[in-house]
Amino acid sequence: SVRPEIPGYIITPALTQKMGVAAIGTFHERQGDEFLLNSSGNLPGAWGRLFGESFDETWSSKISRFEFEVSPSFSGELWGLQAGQDLIGALHDDGSQDRVGLFYAYTGTSGSNGGNTLGRLQFEVGSIDLHANSIGAYWTHIGADGWYVDSIGMYSWLDGGSSSDRGIGADTSGNSVAFSVEAGYPFRFDNGWVLEPQGQLIWQHVDLDDARDRFTGIDHESFGAWTGRLGMRLEANTTMNDVPVQPFASINLWHDFDADYKVSFNRVPVVTELEQTSLELNVGMSAQMSETVSIYGGLQFATGLDDGDNRSYGGNVGLRIKW
């Protein structure tokens, strides 16, 4: 029989990785759109966003010695805020531009967890509460005809913990490093519509500190994981009451590539698989409210394409100020 604390302990690294992907987001979630980046010089602009989602997810985790499937699950919310400052905005004679900046992000996730414990299948047994503070840097190049390459580096500090409904748990701390490269190329049509294929690749390294509760040691093995995205964004450039606006709809295929990590309890390892695929749909709008202020946001729904009932829904809202 598996103790009710075990599912929470073994999915904490996976939730840490998910928080990192959410903090990185996509270029359009952070910046709105290419047409909003129209300032130059030193400290040309600042931006910020709020994001959040409610999600349900299940992983495959096996106790290696016995080939027992714990099947840990989580149901809860992930939220965050992010603020960035462009340090340099360089507009070139050929119409292209480069933008370099720094950002801070705070991300949290909390909810209930369960699994195959106490002789029962998918039994809800406890709760998890995690928080991450992140700092990062970005460089974005936008070509004269609107294509872009966006790259990010980010370092995060994690703290929080998980506990069972019987009041036994352990605190969690650690760190992660993440890098992301994203690109998109717009195809423009005479009626003002734009179709933009996109691709993104994210790498993370997660390193959580070892811990213990009153019964066992909890040893976290550090691990690296890749996440990829292929997307298509449809947008229209128009005006509403003389305000330039850009409604959009997008579809993304997200994939966590084959990777696993170990959490050991008194030297008994539990191996969790991270590979999974999901389909995400987004709708939203960007608007340049004035010469100096722009707003943007969207709604999102995603569903897993593998076995299980993974799904999420959420949103993103942002503000950009040109100094």
For every predicted segment, state its role.
Residues 2-44:
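Outer-membrane beta-barrel biogenesis signature
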Residues 5, 10-11, 40-323:
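Membrane translocator/pore-forming domains, dominated by Gram-negative outer-membrane beta-barrels
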